[in-house]
Curated annotation (Swiss-Prot):
Modification type N-acetylthreonine: residues: T15
Originating organism: Lolium perenne
Any GO BP annotation: photosynthetic electron transport in photosystem II
Alphabetic keyword roster: Acetylation, Chlorophyll, Chloroplast, Chromophore, Manganese, Membrane, Metal-binding, Phosphoprotein, Photosynthesis, Photosystem II, Plastid, Thylakoid, Transmembrane, Transmembrane helix
Residues the entry annotates as binding [CaMn4O5] cluster: E367
Membrane-spanning parts: 69-93, 134-155, 178-200, 255-275, 291-312, 447-471
Protein name per Swiss-Prot or TrEMBL: Photosystem II CP43 reaction center protein
Function, as annotated: One of the components of the core complex of photosystem II (PSII). It binds chlorophyll and helps catalyze the primary light-induced photochemical processes of PSII. PSII is a light-driven water:plastoquinone oxidoreductase, using light energy to abstract electrons from H(2)O, generating O(2) and a proton gradient subsequently used for ATP formation.
Coiled-coil intervals: none
């Protein structure tokens, strides 16, 4: 066995670097990777790599179940979810479980069931992961050719891609079935302040669904993040389900065309880089969705969006001052613009003051007060309902401010409450993860392309200066 110089110097230290400790087919000598390089040692051991992936899935599902039960145990029904730092229960509530009109939690038992089911699933996955990592066959090709693969086998790789796409499509259909037949989902736009309802009138028009994809991503347009009714969301999932299932069948039945064979690098590390790029895109989209969208992420559970809290503040003070006798239609602010109401660049009546920048916010508590030309002065004077006042006052005091280290509120505000919105948590974490996954994509894509070109080894180790230096000791 050839001992590396750096290993020989530390022969007295008992670590996995020592050649004495050998994991069959998983040591540095046979794989080129040391123990800390993790699954890189298993690149060509399909059975062991399966074990690693199943065990990883078990860890993910265990977190979901344990965190779910933790949130149930700490949940206080009298307080809104977003005041309690919850990130899982809002997702379950959005799916229509355990909630009623106005997003009020009526029953926490479905949440408990969800946690227990995830824990049980994680035990099954954990057992499977340990079995395949320690006891199962090292490679699957010989015994189970259907599950075996070689990374450079393009046809097999696209077949695996196809199977994954079909599973994603079926997952998409699960949401559609829940919304249509199994109790419905929570609709924040339901009259009177939100309720659980079955979706009856799906949007299936391709011009509407794909129109979202063609929108500008910037203000007033907002690309797919601008979706603001459940019919479009569930209809989009119908389209997505069919596209994924048919795309999956296509990839199973066909072989890659010549242009695709030339365009892609066909190696394990290349597939890793493609996957990381996809996850990075998902992370950035999720970040924007949870930050700006109050239909897929109802404010009753996640707290108001930033623009929503700002508009709620303007509305709350309009209500107060109108009661005190102010003429909100004509009062001037310090800049000479309207103090309570003004006009947008396109002529609609909007809230005045600093919140003017959020004039294109749409929120269920505000829309009933709009007419054909923006906010309707008549409705503002005669039609404001108590639930709208209560909700806007609540949202005004729960803006999604605060940092990842749980210090809530405006940094300059001496009376700030220590409140951090789940929107802050979820959008920041997904942005950060999206960024790191993108860096991982660049790293592995670079390595994969270099390997394909035949120069992945980096610096020639024979010429490395350290080899000619005296040992430190």
């Amino acid at each position: 066995m050839k001992i590396l110089y750096s290993l020989r110097r530390f022969y007295h230290v008992e670590t996995l670097f020592n050649g004495t400790f050998v994991l069959a087919g998983r040591d540095q000598e046979t794989t080129g990777f040391a123990w800390w390089a993790g699954n890189a040692r298993l690149i060509n051991l399909s059975g062991k790599l399966l074990g690693a992936h199943v065990a990883h899935a078990g860890l993910i599902v265990f977190w979901a179940g344990a965190m779910n039960l933790f949130e149930v145990a700490h949940f206080v029904p009298e307080k809104p979810m977003y005041e309690q730092g919850l990130i899982l229960l809002p997702h379950l509530a959005t799916l229509g479980w355990g909630v009623g009109p106005g997003g009020e939690v009526l029953d926490t038992f479905p949440y408990f069931v969800s946690g227990v089911l995830h824990l049980i699933s994680s035990a099954v996955l954990g057992f499977g992961g340990i079995y395949h990592a320690l006891l199962g066959p090292e490679t699957l090709e010989e015994s189970f050719p259907f599950f075996g693969y070689v990374w450079k086998d393009r046809n097999k790789m696209t077949t695996i891609l196809g199977i994954h796409l079909i599973l994603l499509g079926l997952g998409s259909f699960l949401l559609v079935l829940k919304a249509l037949y199994f109790g419905g989902v929570y609709d924040t736009w339901a009259p009177g302040g939100g309720d659980v309802r079955k979706i009856t009138n799906l949007t299936l028009s391709p011009s509407v669904i794909f129109g979202y994809l063609l929108k500008s991503p910037f203000g007033g347009e907002g690309w797919i993040v601008s979706v603001d009714d459940l019919e479009d969301i569930i209809g989009g999932h119908v389209w997505l389900g069919f596209i994924c299932v048919f795309g999956g069948i296509w990839h199973i039945l066909t072989k890659p065309f010549a242009w695709a064979r030339r365009a892609f690098v066909w190696s394990g590390e290349a597939y890793l880089s493609y996957s990381l790029a996809a996850l990075s895109v998902f992370g950035f989209i999720a970040c924007c969705f949870v930050w700006f969208n109050n239909t897929a992420y109802p404010s009753e559970f996640y707290g108001p969006t930033g623009p929503e809290a700002s508009q709620a503040q303007a509305f709350t003070f309009l209500v107060r001052d109108q009661r005190l006798g102010a003429n909100v239609g004509s009062a001037q602010g310090p800049t000479g613009l309207g103090k309570y109401l003004m006009r947008s660049p396109t002529g609609e009546v909007i809230f005045g003051g600093e919140t003017m920048r959020f004039w294109d916010l749409r929120a269920p508590w505000l829309e009933p007060l709009r007419g054909p030309n923006g906010l309707d002065l008549n409705r503002l004077k005669k039609d404001i309902q108590p639930w709208q006042e209560r909700r806007s006052a609540e949202y005004m005091t729960h803006a999604p401010l605060g940092s990842l280290n749980s210090v809530g509120g405006v940094a300059t505000e001496i009376n700030a409450v220590n409140y951090v919105s789940p929107r802050s948590w979820l959008s920041t974490s997904h942005f950060v993860l999206g960024f790191f996954f993108f860096v991982g994509h660049l790293w592995h894509a670079g390595r994969a392309r270099a390997a394909a070109a035949g120069f992945e080894k980096g610096i020639d180790r024979d010429l490395e200066p350290v080899l000619y230096m005296n040992p430190l000791n």
